[in-house]
Amino acid sequence: YPEKNFAKIERIPKDYPYYTKSLTEEWPTIETIFEKRNAGGIEIAFCKLHIEKKVYGYVNIELGQEVTQGEKIMLDTPLEYDFITKGIVFHAPRPLKIMDESEDEEYTEASGYHATEHVVIEGSNMITGGVSQDLGGISLGTSGLIFIYDGAIGGSGASKALYDRFEKALERSMHIVKECPCKNEAGCPRCTFSYRCGNNNEYLHKYSALEILERINNGEKTELIDPVDGDKPLV
């Protein structure tokens, strides 16, 4: 980080009504595949990952509000860093039915993968013993690759717990989306939103995610692929 930059800290009032959340771009690279298996029809791998992060801004979010979105404030100089950790990767099936009904297929597809990533992480708590807070996620909006990784440098075991119980996590995720009563295309905090989302809970599509999860749980087969040129990472 440039040496001439600095952070100025000021004390805020006790009743300050906001908290901040960073806006990030991330890119995963598989360093080593430790093991692979099929979860239903989905090929899933447990890997050593190199995660590159760029913090380009933050949002102010009002305390107590249900929708975890806020006003964006961009940094003049983004902060970049990287680390090695462990995680899983799988290739989500395309939500072809919802895409066919959409006026913007590219947005609908990418937003479906992003929402699926959110739901699998947040929905894993009851399956893995409460490790979702220790996990990060990246969905690649063109290829449909979804990475879920340990937030701790070197790994923490959280993603391995998810890898071992992945079928149950996928079934649980499908029911979370299907049974949520909200009618919003993007979903809501009960289904697709994440309080840790690095994209301000944008690029989310509830119905696209539901089709993806239904296809997975119905046994549709996919194999791992390489990222494609122009893949848009969403976190």
Residue spans of the language-model regions?
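Extended alpha-helical interface modules used as scaffolds for assembling large macromolecular complexes
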Residues: 225-235
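Short cysteine clusters
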Residues: 187-191
